[in-house]
Amino acid sequence: MRTIAVLTSGGDAPGMNAAIRAVVRTGLEKGLKVMGIQRGYNGLINGEIFEMDTHSVSDIIQRGGTILRTARCEEFRTEQGREKAAKILKAFGIDGLVVIGGDGSFHGAQLLSKLGINTVGLPGTIDNDLAYTDYTIGFDTSINTVLDAINKLRDTSTSHERVSVVEVMGRNCGDIALYTGVAGGAESIIIPEKEYNADKLCKQILQGKLKGKMHNLVLLAEGVGGANELAKYIEEVTGIETRSTILGHIQRGGSPTCMDRILASRMAYKAVELLISGKSSRVVGIKNGKIIDMDIDEALAVERSFDQELYDIATILSK
């Protein structure tokens, strides 16, 4: 192993820069040449590859986003596109590739490994939807961003004695809504993993009003969607002024938290070690506080287990 490369793919996540920094500096310390690939698999196919040194990653650990940029790539979805990508990697003398991204990015790394490319994946996604790992890079920053937003919404919601319906990211995984719902004291948490009844929700809101609640905070994962429509329905049924807020892409930005910076650094260090030791087609994660690695096929096949205990806690504390 003499030359490795790193790319970021899919949706950006805070902490990606910390991971890039750790890959580059660990690789250089181990005597490797390190290349950066811009704009994910799209940049790989177009040969947007450059050599990186320790100064390339100076002053980035505190920055959100990714200095390597990220992009979707339809061509890479084709067999011809992947073969082209593999040839370009070999032409640049790249022996190992670190891919930072979500499940789609991992599927790409998985397919490249079948073409003889040594790959290691790092979980970079705010959704926390990769089941093999307890946490993904970017999740902690995202939930802190959401928590800050709902704290502010609670202030104005209380002043006006209204209901706030807040839609957060999470298509198939409701972790952002669940974690921030518990931490932010939400009265209701609506997530893809659990069915909900709008009429029952309205009844709960009215019961809360009778108990003297000054406001109601409803957190809604985008996988369920319909924040605007739900807000209108709540107001029609309860007669209580209701407003909807869709937080959107603000959840992906911002300076990464201490936890995300450390997690990204630990995972990236492990990724370089794996490549040096000759291991390929692996992904890095964290379980019970320990950095782990596993086969990428096995990791993608792991079924996600829902945190029922945390959901039960949220339900009890919201009353």
From Swiss-Prot:
PROSITE patterns per the UniProt record, alphabetical: PHOSPHOFRUCTOKINASE
For this protein, the Enzyme Commission number is 2.7.1.11
Instruction: Give the matching InterPro entries.
Output: ATP_PFK, ATP_PFK_prok-type, PFKA_ATP_prok, Phosphofructokinase_CS, Phosphofructokinase_dom, PKF_sf
Q: Tell me yes or no: is S-adenosyl-L-methionine among this UniProt entry's keywords.
A: no
According to its UniProt record, which reaction does this protein catalyse? Answer: beta-D-fructose 6-phosphate + ATP = beta-D-fructose 1,6-bisphosphate + ADP + H(+)
Annotated residues for binding of ATP: G11, R72, C73, G102, D103, G104, S105
- Activity control note: Allosterically activated by ADP and other diphosphonucleosides, and allosterically inhibited by phosphoenolpyruvate.
Q: Which cysteines are joined by disulfide bonds?
A: none
Q: Which GO terms describe its molecular function?
A: 6-phosphofructokinase activity; AMP binding; ATP binding; fructose-6-phosphate binding; identical protein binding; metal ion binding; monosaccharide binding
Names of the cofactor(s): Mg(2+)
Residues at the catalytic site: D127 (proton acceptor)
Enzyme class name = transferase
Binding annotation for Mg(2+) = D103
Of the GO CC terms on this record, one is: 6-phosphofructokinase complex
Q: What does this protein do?
A: Catalyzes the phosphorylation of D-fructose 6-phosphate to fructose 1,6-bisphosphate by ATP, the first committing step of glycolysis.
Q: Which protein are we looking at?
A: ATP-dependent 6-phosphofructokinase
* Taxon lineage: Bacteria, Bacillati, Bacillota, Clostridia, Eubacteriales
